[in-house]
Design a protein with these regions (language model features):
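Conserved SAM/SAH-binding loop
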Residues: 8-13
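Extreme N-terminal starter segment of soluble prokaryotic enzymes
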Residues: 2-6
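Class I S-adenosyl-L-methionine
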Residues: 17-28, 32-64, 79-230
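Active-site donor-binding segments of glycosyltransferases and PAPS-dependent sulfotransferases
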Residues: 66-78
Length: 230
């Protein structure tokens, strides 16, 4: 049975209390100032097969004071306490990262929309670049059986509770491909808590920090609700 520890705290002081290489794998999604110079788009546009454009409502999220790129000290501590790392948005932090042969490309299958086609993750692994396909555009989300195909039953869609929320299926894929049985995982920016659900289902121990009380409580509730459904 997995052990999930969620902490409502600033991750930097927390990491300073951790031992060297205490965690086998860090899977993190640090902020990179997405709301600093622009407002979040209120509607998501998806191009349909017939060529028409479909506008779907997206959740609106307030800009938070903590939404800033982490310092060098953050990355120094992250590398100290973990043996391997997967860092989402690594393309925004290149000045803090070494060259890597193994980037992860998440194809969100939303070509023709106003959103980014892909998101990138830097990794410390010595393998080739890998791509994962899972639709993620407003109300258009991939199905559990085939991430490239839109889920027909909208009741099965994940509720958006965070502006940079990523699907649980993506974290399951990461754990399946990059974590080993018995690995201890750390996430410094829990956000929506998707990683907690994936670790719970796959049996990985997780330690996670979330500085924002609103998101921490929402992610904690999401995990509790998920456990009831399992």
């Amino acid at each position: 049975m997995s052990r999930i520890e969620l902490h409502n705290c600033d991750c930097l002081p927390f990491m300073k209390q951790c031992s060297d290489k205490q965690f086998d794998l860090a899977i993190v999604d640090p902020p990179y100032g997405i709301g600093k110079d622009k407002k979040f788009i209120k509607k998501c546009m998806t191009k349909q097969k017939n060529g028409k454009r479909l506008f779907t409502k997206c959740n609106n999220f307030s800009i938070k004071e903590w939404d800033e790129i982490p310092s060098q000290e953050y990355f120094t501590e992250l590398f100290r306490i973990s043996k391997n790392q997967i860092i989402w948005g690594g393309n925004y932090f290149v000045e803090h990262l070494k060259n890597s042969s193994c980037w992860i490309v998440w194809d969100k299958c939303n070509v023709g929309t106003m959103q980014s086609d892909c998101e990138l993750a830097w990794t410390s692994f010595k393998t080739a670049v890998r791509k994962y396909e899972f639709m993620w555009s407003g109300m258009c989300q991939g199905s559990e059986s085939n991430g490239k195909i839109m889920e027909g039953n909208k009741k099965l869609n994940e509720k958006r509770i965070h502006p940079t929320q990523k699907p649980v299926a993506l974290y399951k894929w990461l754990l399946h491909n990059y974590a080993k049985e018995g690995d201890k995982i750390i996430d410094t920016h829990l956000g929506s808590g998707s990683i907690a659900l994936a670790c719970e289902e796959y049996g990985f121990d997780l330690t996670a920090c979330e500085i924002d009380k609103e998101y921490f409580e929402a992610a904690s509730k999401r995990l509790s609700d998920y456990r009831v459904q399992m």
